[in-house]
């Protein structure tokens, strides 16, 4: 059976991930007119720039959908976001600022929950608005087929008939008007935005050029912290975790993770926390650039890692970072539910996150400028009395340290011998002015 359909399957049910925007509206209407039977599915991901979710399915019905459903994905989205924080599943960083994989997390939830809803309705053909150059086409492909092995894919934007008739936004707008719908194109921005409750992605158009900075972006989850005319007073905030799960903000306990994430977004957003500019490597290994917002994820991540460093030992922390980066890349590639990702997630949540209990107090200022004011946990292995510089009882004596240093003589001797061995082979240079061989200055060798 062909998995990807190049042309419209006339007379068959097609599920379309319907956002209510111009692209999906025109595609749905076009498919109905050409003889397909479209079903519309809209994911409620708590998008900060969406005002009326209930109106979206109604519009889909007006445009010819056989049926239209609104699928509430918020709870699952937040659950996956918290899992990503527990695992440190983030691999794109620039200058210490992190991209929290908010779009990949959204695609994992959307791709599985919408296809599951389609399967309930007997719809086994799926279409969405992802383009052939991007990451989402592969993410949705993987998650869709994982959820429904019988799934076939039809994308209007890969259909030459659709492209020839409605290849641009102007053509789509004119098509809608000609069909009796008073559809006005939204004002063109200098970039495109995709968002969910965890974060927002701004990319494309002017942002494809690296001389266009964050200053052209209008944040939808925070403030323009770079604009000195925007007043942002400093604010203290406390974040409490229990066994790796965020449970309280500023002393208020949340039983609903969705409400907790919304409040974390409000707190972080007041300062522009979690906004970053990243050059990343797409799945197809071409580089792209995005400007990201994730105020709540950033707030929780900072507090989580503060507790992590005070609770776990060095080797555990090293494994957390290494496995987290690996898991973040799998998430980015659309492999969040693959066996290798599940193995890493289980290990990190079981042996790392389970011990993260405590409370962190921070002072948030402008953007990603913050200070940690206090860290409290019953699981802290940080014990100031162990290494105090003050006179008093100590867990080890000067003689103990002399013995420990003496034992280092063995590997110091081995290292010295290796260095002189490298010098003999020409990898290092040796001179009377230096006690050990050193790498030669390449400039002196004309290289």
UniProtKB/Swiss-Prot annotation:
HAMAP family: Arg_succ_synth_type2. L-citrulline binds at residues 99, 135, 139, 192, 201, 203, 280. GO terms for biological process: argininosuccinate metabolic process; L-arginine biosynthetic process; urea cycle. L-aspartate binds at residues 131, 135-136. It comes from Escherichia coli (strain K12). Belongs to the argininosuccinate synthase family. Type 2 subfamily. This is Argininosuccinate synthase. InterPro entries: Arg_succ_synth_type2_subfam, Arginosuc_syn_C, Arginosuc_syn_N, Arginosuc_synth, Arginosuc_synth_CS, Arginosuc_synth_type_1_subfam, AS_cat/multimer_dom_body, AS_multimer_C_tail. The gene is argG. The monomer is composed of two major structural domains: a nucleotide-binding domain and a catalytic/multimerization domain. Binding of ATP results in a large rigid body conformational change of the nucleotide binding domain. GO terms for cellular component: cytoplasm; cytosol. Its main location: cytoplasm. It catalyses: L-citrulline + L-aspartate + ATP = 2-(N(omega)-L-arginino)succinate + AMP + diphosphate + H(+). Its EC number is 6.3.4.5.
